[in-house]
Swiss-Prot record:
It comes from Burkholderia ambifaria (strain ATCC BAA-244 / DSM 16087 / CCUG 44356 / LMG 19182 / AMMD). The complex is composed of two ATP-binding proteins (SsuB), two transmembrane proteins (SsuC) and a solute-binding protein (SsuA). The gene is ssuB. GO terms for cellular component: plasma membrane. Part of the ABC transporter complex SsuABC involved in aliphatic sulfonates import. Responsible for energy coupling to the transport system. It is found in: Cell inner membrane. Its EC number is 7.6.2.14. Its main location: membrane. This is Aliphatic sulfonates import ATP-binding protein SsuB. Keywords: ATP-binding, Cell inner membrane, Cell membrane, Membrane, Nucleotide-binding, Translocase, Transport.
Amino acid sequence: MNATTSAAAYGPLAGADLEAELAQARVTDDAVRDAAIVDRDGGASVVPLARRRPGSPAPGDAVTLSGVSKRFGTRTVLDNVELGIARGSFVAIVGRSGCGKSTLLRLVAGLETPSSGALATRGEGGGTLDTRIMYQDARLLPWKTVLQNVMLGLGRGARDRARAVLDEVGLLERANDWPAQLSGGQRQRVALARALVHRPQLLLLDEPLGALDALTRIEMHALIERLWREHRFTALLVTHDVQEAVALGDRILLIEQGRVALDQQVPLDRPRARASAAFAALEDRVLQRVLAGGPGGADQEAAREVDHVRPVGQIRWAV
């Protein structure tokens, strides 16, 4: 895929354009409301969510970047990036604010196109790589219940799948509640369920836990790791938290001044023992490398605010 390829070629991403998504939701409100009736006494049965594929992930790279650069006006945010993301791996991306890590995630998602170079995504069997993205803001529709939010964009037949994935994230009993009734961590669990109900091959995580307290973050780490191990999707996490990167990643990438400055494997057993000397040593090694890079200048990614205004109708609503 070259720099001129349409973002649509990346395949489905957590629903269609925002306007189309909201229009679809209004059309199907009655059907979804009927489907969202859940027995509060817990008597309703739950059909386990089918695993997308059993066993080990298929070999090869799910995402490949070859000489990819991204510029906003005169600012170069990513500079000649060469990178392959192995299918079924969990890759964490760290770096200072403005280094280009979120821009990299948006390129992989198809929300931006490269200024130069080639970016290829490949699903199993050579098909489309089904991709979902999760942000720090859960982006739940406040006028829909938890179950309706998970079912957004899906038909009545998805009710059992939605209930099953809510059960997996520990929120089946909150299916009839409104988003305003949930804590921040619970809202992020709903956002995660809404991504997983589509059984994605690639899950992109753009600092999804940044606004949560420390204990809730640790709980979410365990949940994300468990679901990743069960479903074997490819995961790409952007985070400022080096400890989070070591806790979740098989591999840690440091983006510095638009380039991959460090590519560190994480040779630690799962689940990660955070109190172990090996964990602390690896965390310190990566953190010291991040600090050694210096502040690196102004926040280049903020250039999107000035130089790259995207029409509302083109904005994709992720997750």
